[in-house]
Amino acid sequence: MDIIENHDAWVETYTQNWLAHYNETGETKWDLYNRPNNKTAPSGKAIDLKQAKLVMISSAGAYLPDSQEAYDAENDLGDYTIRLIPNGTAYDKIAYAHTHYDHTAVNMDTQVLIPTGHLRDLVEAGEIGSLTDDFISFMGYQPNAAQVAEETVPAIIEASKAQGATGALLVPS
């Protein structure tokens, strides 16, 4: 299944409209942006969460400032890289480089976007089998959907498989 249905047509529209306007003016004009609209929702077979090894994937732009480079949050064209963060990391060691959402809630309670404590509680209660060693974060502001499909998604899949994940929890920002 294609990540973006009609991939080439989407790239052509993106390049000729939103990106061309941005390159000419330096302005992000969102009424020119054609969001991908798939007709088929991806799915797979159901999993038993009590037996699953779950990876959490967050678009919060989380990173470890003491050891990882921040995302390029000011780049109008986005940052398509990922960061792996150990699940046991203290919340005060995590920072957020993402300027495209209101940080009020996450500043008050990190678990609204990084619910690792709640997930560990569910593992302890036997509701989830286990968690991967690391969770995955990326900066959700990524206007080039083709680049997401060609770079970000494969990197997330590779990192998830390397940790033996059998299921994923997606946490949008």
What do the predicted segments below correspond to?
Residues 1-173:
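Metallocofactor- and cofactor-centric catalytic cores in central/energy metabolism, strongly enriched
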